Regions:
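Bacterial N-terminal signal peptides that target proteins for export
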Residues: 2-12
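Cleavable N-terminal signal peptides
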Residues: 13-14, 24
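Short, surface-exposed beta-strand/loop micro-motifs that present aromatic residues
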Residues: 99-100, 203, 250-254
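Mid-chain, structured segments of secreted extracytoplasmic proteins
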Residues: 72-114
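Terminal, regulation- and interaction-focused segments at domain boundaries
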Residues: 27-68, 122, 143-218
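Hydrophobic alpha-helical segments and helix pairs
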Residues: 110-151
Length: 310
């Protein structure tokens, strides 16, 4: 009898430990986007107020644009983000956080990227919770959203969508130059000429680091008629949930020393849409050519040469 009770107690203790570990994991899980508020009206009515609140909390607006009529994206940075971006030689991607105003039906959704999530995904060696707090104080924080289940910092640091898909550090090398200055000038020149269907959204130079990150919009127009690089087409396929993940845009080019690179599309898309299905309606299958099409446009604007992967 004593042995039976001891066995039962042991199983009960194990069950409690499992439940406790699951609770801790759920508490530590993060999602890529944070909903600030939902209101009525139109996008234009919200713009000045949002930018004023951001400025009041020390954020600098480095760029903004409307990728399509129902969305407006404001890219911000501050000293803490720039410092975090200098924590390693590929951390520049975290420097610009997106604040989005999106019309969905009669609703206006104001949201922003989760800097703590992005910091973990980009392996940043800094605590960005204070940045998240400042965004919350400026705009509000109703809830995190995106995938059904979040990811922990540990999972994000080694994230890839599935076997054979790229990790954070498996980037697309776009071009190489003799110096950082020359590389930056080449990207600026390409963006000014809208090569590859691109336009410049922002530029952030990372203090204390030979990193410069550009935000790049992409549209299939003029001589660039490949719909698979067009951000409107891509978002129409993958951003279909009631709460829109507009802050996925824009894509980035990072000048890292004298080299020019971009995150691989199969990582860049997946880390913001980790529960996107592989096949079916609204799936990766529908945008299968997009990672290569994005790479080609970014390579052209960086002054590089197109090279087939296979």
């Amino acid at each position: 009898m004593i042995q039976v009770k001891s066995t039962c107690l042991a199983y009960l203790a194990m069950a409690m430990m499992v439940l406790a570990s699951l609770a801790v994991k759920a508490e530590d899980e993060m999602k890529p986007f944070i909903l600030a508020s939902v209101s009525s009206g139109n996008i234009a009515d919200q713009l000045d107020g949002v930018k004023s609140e951001l400025g009041g909390k020390g954020f600098e607006v480095v760029g903004e644009y409307s990728p399509y009529p129902t969305a407006h994206i404001i890219v911000v940075t501050n000293d803490a983000l720039k410092k975090a971006a200098a924590s390693h030689d590929r951390a520049g991607y975290v420097a610009g956080q997106r604040v989005t105003i999106t019309r969905v039906g009669d609703e206006i959704q104001i949201a922003y990227t989760n800097p703590v999530y992005m910091g973990a995904a980009y392996r940043v060696k800094a605590d960005l919770s204070a940045v998240a707090d400042s965004l919350r104080e400026a705009l509000g924080a109703d809830k995190e959203y995106g995938p059904e289940e979040g990811l922990t910092a540990e999972e994000l640091e080694k994230y890839h969508y599935t076997f054979g898909m790229e990790y954070f550090d498996e980037t697309n090398r776009l071009a190489s130059y003799n110096s950082h200055k020359e590389a930056v000038a080449a990207v600026e020149k390409g963006l000014a000429a809208h090569i590859g269907g691109t336009s410049k959204v922002y530029r952030i130079d990372i203090p204390g680091s030979k990193q410069t990150v550009f935000g790049v919009s992409m549209a299939a127009k003029g001589e660039t008629d490949n719909k698979f690089m067009d951000e409107s087409f891509i978002m129409n396929e993958i951003d279909f949930k009631p709460l829109r993940s507009t802050g996925h845009l824009p894509y980035e080019i990072l000048v890292k020393g004298s080299d020019v690179e971009a995150l691989h599309g199969r990582f860049r898309i997946a880390v913001n849409f980790p529960d996107l299905s592989m096949m079916g309606e609204n799936s990766f299958m529908n945008i299968m050519p997009s990672p290569d099409a994005i790479k080609d446009s970014l390579t052209l604007v960086a002054g590089g040469n197109l090279v087939d992967d296979f």
